[in-house]
C-alpha cells in the first residue's frame, strides 16, 4: 500500500510511558490509525503481553495486518464495540486503554476521503467508507433545524442557522446544478456565509468538523468507550486519552472527574469519609505537546492528553 499520506503520532512517548505499567499486561489501542502508538506499545511489552487494537478505517486495517506479531490483534470496528469484542475473546480485564481521538492526517490529507475543505473531493467524511451514511447523503435530507443543531453543537459555529439555510437553498437547486456532493462546493457555501475570519482558521473549519462528528457519531461513541474502559480496567490499570478539540476534551474531563470524586453526602448525616465507597479512578494529570513537537507537527497544537488510573477494584 502507498504511503503518500503520512501520519505523525502525537505525544507518542508520553502516551506509551503513561499507559504501559506492566510488560505482561493486556492493552487496548482504541484508535490504531497508522499504528504509531501500537508499535510503541508492542516494543514495551514482554513475551506474555498482548495488544488489541481497533479502527473503523479499512486503510488502517490494511496497515495493521502488516504487523506480524503474535501478541497483536486488530479489530475492524469502532472503539465503541470494545467491551463486546473483548468479551468475545474472553478478556474481562485489561491493564490499559489508549484513545487517540479525532481524524488522522492520512484521512484529512487524502481528498478522496472527503474530510478536507482545502482540496476538492467527494463529500464523504466516513471513517469507514463501506458503512453508514455519507456526508453528502445526510446533507441531502437533513432539515434546517437538524443542520443548525449539528453545526452549532458540534462545530460551535455562531453562523450555524445561516449556513443551514444556505445548504438547504443550494439543495433546492439540485435539479439544475446537480447534488451537493463535493467538499469544494460545501466550503464555498460556508465561505459565502461566514464573513468574519478567525486568524489561521478557514471559515469552513467548524462546519466540516461538525458534519464529520455527526456522520461518524464520534461523541456518542466516545461516551460509550469511556464507560467500557472504566469497566475493563484492572486495579492499577491506566486510561490515556488524547483529544484535539474542546468538545472531546470536555466529555473526557467530566467523565474522569465524575469517577475520581467521592459521592456527595449531606453533611448532616452521621457518615464518615472512610465509610464512603472509594472513587474508582485517580487523576494523574494532563499533558500537552511541547514546542518542538508543535513546530514539527502543527496539527499537534490543540492536543491535550489526560491520564487516569483505576485505584478501586
Curated annotation (Swiss-Prot):
Regions that span the bilayer: none
Compartment(s) of residence: Cytoplasm
Keywords: Cytoplasm, Methyltransferase, rRNA processing, S-adenosyl-L-methionine, Transferase
EC number(s) from the headed UniProt entry: 2.1.1.199
Domain of life: Bacteria
GO BP annotation list: rRNA base methylation
Pfam family, one: Methyltransf_5
GO cellular component: cytoplasm
GO molecular-function terms, A-Z: rRNA (cytosine-N4-)-methyltransferase activity
Binding site for S-adenosyl-L-methionine: 35-37, 55, 79, 100, 107
Principal location listed in the UniProt entry: cytoplasm
Catalytic activity: cytidine(1402) in 16S rRNA + S-adenosyl-L-methionine = N(4)-methylcytidine(1402) in 16S rRNA + S-adenosyl-L-homocysteine + H(+)
Family, as annotated: Belongs to the methyltransferase superfamily. RsmH family.
Main function: Specifically methylates the N4 position of cytidine in position 1402 (C1402) of 16S rRNA.
UniProt-listed NCBIfam families: 16S rRNA (cytosine(1402)-N(4))-methyltransferase RsmH
HAMAP family: 16SrRNA_methyltr_H
Protein name: Ribosomal RNA small subunit methyltransferase H
Organism name: Burkholderia pseudomallei (strain K96243)
Gene that encodes it: rsmH
Amino acid at each position: 500500500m502507498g504511503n503518500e499520506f503520512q501520519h505523525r503520532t502525537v505525544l507518542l512517548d508520553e502516551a506509551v510511558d503513561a499507559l504501559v505499567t506492566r510488560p505482561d499486561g493486556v492493552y487496548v489501542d482504541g484508535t490504531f490509525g497508522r499504528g504509531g502508538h501500537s508499535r510503541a506499545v508492542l516494543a514495551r511489552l514482554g513475551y506474555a503481553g498482548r495488544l488489541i487494537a481497533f479502527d473503523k478505517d479499512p486503510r488502517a486495517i490494511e496497515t495493521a495486518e502488516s504487523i506480524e506479531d503474535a501478541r497483536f490483534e486488530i479489530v475492524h470496528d469502532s472503539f465503541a464495540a470494545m467491551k463486546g469484542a473483548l468479551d468475545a475473546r474472553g478478556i474481562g480485564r485489561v491493564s490499559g486503554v489508549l484513545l487517540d481521538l479525532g481524524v488522522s492526517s492520512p484521512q484529512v490529507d487524502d481528498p478522496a476521503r472527503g474530510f478536507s475543505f482545502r482540496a476538492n473531493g467527494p463529500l464523504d467524511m466516513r471513517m469507514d467508507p463501506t458503512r453508514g451514511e455519507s456526508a453528502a447523503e445526510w446533507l441531502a435530507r437533513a432539515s434546517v433545524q437538524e443542520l443548525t443543531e449539528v453545526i452549532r453543537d458540534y462545530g460551535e459555529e455562531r453562523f450555524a442557522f445561516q449556513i443551514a439555510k444556505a445548504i438547504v437553498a443550494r439543495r433546492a437547486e439540485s435539479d439544475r446544478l446537480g447534488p451537493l456532493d463535493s467538499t469544494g462546493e460545501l466550503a464555498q457555501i460556508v465561505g459565502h456565509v461566514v464573513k468574519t475570519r478567525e486568524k489561521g482558521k478557514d471559515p469552513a473549519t467548524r462546519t466540516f468538523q461538525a458534519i464529520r462528528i455527526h456522520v461518524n457519531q464520534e461523541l456518542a461513541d466516545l461516551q460509550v468507550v469511556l464507560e467500557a474502559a472504566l469497566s475493563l480496567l484492572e486495579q492499577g490499570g491506566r486510561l490515556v486519552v488524547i483529544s484535539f478539540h474542546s468538545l472531546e476534551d470536555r466529555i473526557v474531563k467530566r467523565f474522569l472527574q465524575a469517577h475520581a470524586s467521592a459521592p456527595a453526602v449531606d453533611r448532616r448525616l452521621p457518615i464518615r469519609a472512610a465509610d464512603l465507597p472509594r472513587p474508582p479512578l485517580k487523576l494523574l494529570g494532563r499533558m500537552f505537546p511541547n514546542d518542538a513537537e508543535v513546530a514539527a507537527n502543527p496539527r499537534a497544537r490543540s492536543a491535550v492528553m489526560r491520564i487516569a488510573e483505576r485505584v478501586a477494584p
